[in-house]
Amino acid sequence: MDVFKKGFSIAKEGVVGAVEKTKQGVTEAAEKTKEGVMYVGTKTKENVVQSVTSVAEKTKEQANAVSEAVVSSVNTVANKTVEEAENIVVTTGVVRKEDLEPPAQDQEAKEQEENEEAKSGED
């Protein structure tokens, strides 16, 4: 009987030791898993913030490009409208063409402004 008791006692100690090792291993694995999950979560959060910032910046750039195009288009339409209105009043005889011609200094300023608008439209 003593042999059995001693054998079972040794086996019991082995099982208890294995359980302790298993418990320790599971605890360590859980801690490492938690670290890994937290790391992934942190990196994902950083990447999401970076992505949102990047998208916001690109959206701002596109909005600026669109607004510049709209302003340029509106200026072109306004200039064409004025030109056509001048043509109509001259054709109908309401005003003489000479009366519509701006003084030479105003004409130079207008040409310079149109050149600047053309340059800004190219950017």
Swiss-Prot record:
Spell out the residue ranges that the record assigns to sequence repeats. 20-30, 31-41, 42-56, 57-67
Record's subcellular location: Cytoplasm, Perinuclear region; Cytoplasm, Cytoskeleton, Microtubule organizing center, Centrosome; Cytoplasm, Cytoskeleton, Spindle
A Pfam family (short name) is: Synuclein
Q: Which Gene3D superfamilies match?
A: Helix hairpin bin
* Region ranges (4 X 11 AA tandem repeats of [EGSA]-K-T-K-[EQ]-[GQ]-V-X(4)): 20-67
The processes (GO biological process) annotated in the record are: adult locomotory behavior; chemical synaptic transmission; protein secretion; regulation of dopamine secretion; regulation of neurotransmitter secretion; synapse organization
Tissues with expression: Highly expressed in brain, particularly in the substantia nigra. Also expressed in the corpus callosum, heart, skeletal muscle, ovary, testis, colon and spleen. Weak expression in pancreas, kidney and lung. Expressed predominantly in the cell bodies and axons of primary sensory neurons, sympathetic neurons and motoneurons.
Function of the molecule: Plays a role in neurofilament network integrity. May be involved in modulating axonal architecture during development and in the adult. In vitro, increases the susceptibility of neurofilament-H to calcium-dependent proteases. May also function in modulating the keratin network in skin. Activates the MAPK and Elk-1 signal transduction pathway.
Q: Which family does it belong to?
A: Belongs to the synuclein family.
Task: Output this protein's name.
Answer: Gamma-synuclein
Which organism was this protein described from?
A: Mus musculus
Supply the source organism's classification: Eukaryota, Metazoa, Chordata, Craniata, Vertebrata
Q: Which gene encodes it?
A: Sncg
